Amino acid sequence: GVGFKAGVKDYRLTYYTPEYKTKDTDILAAFRMTPQPGVPAEERGAAVAAESSTGTWTTVQTDGLTSLDRYKGRCYDIEPVAGEENQYIAYVAYPLDLFEEGSVTNMLTSIVGNVFGFKALRALXXEDLRIPPAYSKTFIGPPHGIQVERDKLNKYGRPLLGCTIKPKLGLSAKNYGRAVYECLRGGLDFTKDDENVNSQPFMRWRDRFLFVAEALFKSQAETGEIKGHYLNATAGTCEEMMKRAVFARELGVPIVMHDYLTGGFTANTSLAFYCRDNGLLLHIHRAMHAVIDRPRNHGIHFRVLAKALRMSGGDHIHAGTVVGKLEGEREVTLGFVDLLRDDYIEKDRSRGIYFTQDWVSMPGVLPVASGGIHVWHMPALTEIFGDDSVLQFGGGTLGHPWGNAPGAVANRVALEACVQARNEGRDLAREGNEIIREASK
């Protein structure tokens, strides 16, 4: 007789295993599935598990040469999404052996690489991943982490202040350096290259690096505080990116920056290794994230991209602002902020956290609040994000009617006032505006 039967077969026979007990070493994923009408949810969940692990659409001769039971992804639970017609959360467990050690690139290729174009699904969204310690221990993670960064900068007990230099495109290197100096001299801890400032005709990277370094050292000498500017090392090739990081180190600056999604996880992990070996902090911008995470029913939720970044490596990452958004958003944002900086995060569906995540002492990442915030948001930001955060005001610094340095002074004064008021037990939510008004005198 024949060894196996060819032909299209039901996935759920092999890949839907509701009796499966998940292992501590499994990578677990939660997918939000919107099936095409008329397709049973179990079959869809099983299909997702199969296509992102060992399955293909038919039985193949080589299946006989391996142990499917050892290597297959399993859909072990399916629950309907409350309040949504025809939408389910499918839980899939992947055996650890399916993944290359220390490669975020391979992890994402495996889990979300192919299955999102699946005809039988109208939409699919990876909501969360549980990274087991057995896997996370194969990554270096953030080059330094929150505690080491505070020690390097000698700044404690308050959020850090940043500012993106605007106009982001068109300034010459010397004028750019001047804006950096004014902001740092006024009281900010950091200034920042915009994510799309790389090396353009109006300002080549090397000139910018030189003038910025001069601004850093001058402001440091005058304020007696350690200052930084996120020099964007993102480039068209990995070699060029490393060249820029090396030059930053030679100048003796404390921090460089990378656009991790457009630059890619492979480049990002290389840069993180270099930063750890050479004492550079690494600021991460998430340009392109909304392309991937904005649709609610399709794509990858930002909490997954955030976990991936913590594994790949970065000391700061942009994480939204929360201010002025809906309450529900606030809880979800704080969920992934905790996933970035805490060591142990309990499962909590109200905050979008589908799995308990234990990072087993991998360093944390500072969340950066940036985009459309200004000095009147300071009380809310201090309360929501707490001390371990970077608050970045671009237009909210440079837009000050008296100029850049007074804008920086205003932000620093407001921050110190809010931190002091909080430490004295005042209610920032209620008295915020009053606190800012008093401080501005």
Swiss-Prot record:
Cofactor remark from the record: Binds 1 Mg(2+) ion per subunit.
Record keywords: Calvin cycle, Carbon dioxide fixation, Chloroplast, Disulfide bond, Lyase, Magnesium, Metal-binding, Methylation, Monooxygenase, Oxidoreductase, Photorespiration, Photosynthesis, Plastid
Cofactor: Mg(2+)
GO cellular component: chloroplast
Modification note: The disulfide bond which can form in the large chain dimeric partners within the hexadecamer appears to be associated with oxidative stress and protein turnover.
E.C. numbers: 4.1.1.39
Record's keyword annotation contains Transcription: no
Protein's cellular compartments: Plastid, Chloroplast
Principal EC category: lyase
Site (Transition state stabilizer): 325
GO BP term, pick one: reductive pentose-phosphate cycle
Binding site for Mg(2+): 192, 194-195
Binding site for substrate: 114, 164, 168, 286, 318, 370
Reactions the enzyme catalyzes: 2 (2R)-3-phosphoglycerate + 2 H(+) = D-ribulose 1,5-bisphosphate + CO2 + H2O; D-ribulose 1,5-bisphosphate + O2 = 2-phosphoglycolate + (2R)-3-phosphoglycerate + 2 H(+)
Recorded family membership: Belongs to the RuBisCO large chain family. Type I subfamily.
Note: The basic functional RuBisCO is composed of a large chain homodimer in a 'head-to-tail' conformation. In form I RuBisCO this homodimer is arranged in a barrel-like tetramer with the small subunits forming a tetrameric 'cap' on each end of the 'barrel'.
Subunit details: Heterohexadecamer of 8 large chains and 8 small chains; disulfide-linked. The disulfide link is formed within the large subunit homodimers.
Protein name stated in the entry: Ribulose bisphosphate carboxylase large chain
Organism: Argyrochosma delicatula
The encoding gene: rbcL
